């Protein structure tokens, strides 16, 4: 039994599982805490939820989480799963190393590469970008990458560039918005991202939030709006789809990692340790 949000997010990692029937409609979600706890955890949880509702953090996180989960089919998930088994293992350690070096979740870097090239290190676009992370020649030179078709150089260059974009964001933009805007800038260019922020600010909207900027980026394809900003026309829908896709791929890869790790841990436990673990569960949970 799962709630609708959990099903929406996790259905891709288990594409063979479907909805049998609904038990209730739109009931609130509750958190259960063991009776023997001293109240510290439940107090902090209630405090966080209250504050997150007041400053709309909860709303923003929910929108980010659900913005991509319904846009992908079982076929999309199957293709991603297949390539995650056949292509990703070759590059996994490089993604992990780059993630540690630049303080970026390696699943996110791997998701970027899947979005850019489907983990094809020979990928070449008609626009001139190429390689696993689809670097432009200018970006490759800036990141000191000599061979864009070398997958390991490409991972280094793309990771370094994303880290740079994230570092030069306005200091009042915090996570996760900081990384999400850096992703959009990686796709459409920082200048167009800043133009979208200007449009949002003119309307009195919070230009530090990705949930705001994703609504204004598409306006850059309309002359009424792009003619009033510095960097002009942009296909503003593309960076929105780009970020949504990467978030989906990242979530899929993280769930896949968790599932794999969980299965490994379970298989290594003997019956006695399982018995002890079960006996330790408070009867109130």
Task: Tell what function each PLM region has.
Residues 1-8, 105-106, 110, 136:
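Beta->alpha turn/N-cap motifs
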Residues 241-285:
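Low-complexity, Gly/Ser/Thr/Pro-rich intrinsically disordered linker/tail segments
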Residues 69-118, 152-155, 169-170:
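Export/targeting segments at the very N-terminus of extracytoplasmic proteins
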Residues 27-70, 88-89, 240-243, 249-256:
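Extended ligand-binding regions for polar small-molecule ligands
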Residues 122-146, 151-164, 246:
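Substrate-binding/active-site groove segments that recognize
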Residues 22, 30-33, 43-44, 180-252:
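Catalytic and substrate-binding regions of cell-wall glycan-acting enzymes that process beta-1,4-linked
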Residues 1-25, 194-195, 199-205:
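A ligand-binding cleft/hinge motif common to bilobed small-molecule-binding domains
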Residues 8-47, 73-76, 221-222:
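Periplasmic-binding protein-like
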């Amino acid at each position: 039994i799962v709630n609708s949000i959990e099903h929406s997010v996790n259905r891709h990692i288990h594409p063979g599982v479907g909805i049998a029937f609904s038990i209730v409609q739109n009931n609130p979600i509750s958190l259960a805490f063991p009776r023997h706890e001293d109240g510290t955890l439940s107090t902090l949880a209630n405090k966080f939820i209250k504050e997150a509702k007041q400053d709309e953090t909860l709303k923003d996180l929910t929108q980010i989480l659900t913005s991509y989960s319904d846009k992908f089919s079982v076929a999309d998930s199957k293709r991603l799963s297949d390539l995650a088994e056949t292509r990703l293992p070759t590059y996994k350690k490089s993604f992990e190393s780059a993630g540690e070096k630049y303080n970026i979740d390696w699943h996110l870097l791997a998701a970027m590469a899947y979005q850019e090239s489907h983990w094809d290190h020979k990928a070449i676009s008609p626009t001139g970008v190429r390689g696993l992370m689809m670097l432009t020649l200018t970006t490759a030179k800036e990141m000191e990458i000599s061979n864009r078709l070398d997958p390991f150089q490409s991972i280094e260059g793309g990771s370094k560039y994303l880290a740079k974009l994230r570092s030069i964001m306005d200091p009042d933009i915090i996570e996760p918005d900081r990384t999400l805007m850096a992703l959009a800038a990686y796709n459409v260019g920082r200048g167009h991202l800043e133009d979208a922020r200007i449009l949002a600010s003119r309307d009195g909207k919070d230009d530090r939030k990705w949930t705001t900027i994703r609504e204004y980026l598409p306006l850059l394809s309309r002359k009424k709006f792009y003619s009033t900003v510095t960097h002009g026309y942009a296909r503003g829908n593309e960076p929105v789809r780009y970020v949504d896709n990467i978030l989906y791929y990242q979530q899929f890869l993280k769930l896949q990692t968790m599932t794999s790790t969980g299965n490994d841990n379970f298989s290594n436990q003997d019956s006695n340790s399982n018995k002890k673990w079960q006996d330790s569960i408070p009867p109130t949970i």
